[in-house]
Amino acid sequence: MSLVRAHFLVKGFVQGVGFRYFVLRQAAALQLNGWVRNRYNGSVEGVVEGPEAEVKEFLDRCRRGPAWAEVKEVKVQYEEPRGETTFRIRSSV
């Protein structure tokens, strides 16, 4: 099983609509680790680590977002896995 790490940035109407909690639930459902946080520019940033197939599914779910969000763009940069052990919501930056 190949582990991957994806650093993602979601743009659109994604703050104030529970997007971070949506991301947290998707990561838990797919048994992935990492973090998510709001950025002061209105985007949502995060990192997810796990098996490649599950990470791809997670990113697809982020592109769809919850019903009340409006996702305009998801940028993804793959990095070397760093051994994240949980998935958490971080403070905004």
From Swiss-Prot:
Pfam families given in the database record: Acylphosphatase (PF00708)
- Give yes or no: UniProt keyword Hydrolase: yes
- Name the Gene3D superfamilies on file: 3.30.70.100
Q: Which GO terms describe its molecular function?
A: acylphosphatase activity
Q: Does the keyword Hydrolase apply?
A: yes
- The active site consists of 20, 38
- Cite the EC number: 3.6.1.7
Q: Which residues form the Acylphosphatase-like domain?
A: 5-91
| Keywords for this protein | Hydrolase
Name the enzyme's class: hydrolase
Q: Which reactions is this enzyme annotated as catalysing?
A: an acyl phosphate + H2O = a carboxylate + phosphate + H(+)
Sequence similarity: Belongs to the acylphosphatase family.
UniProt-recorded name of the protein = Acylphosphatase
Give the classification, highest ranks: Bacteria, Bacillati, Bacillota, Clostridia, Moorellales
Q: Which gene encodes it?
A: acyP
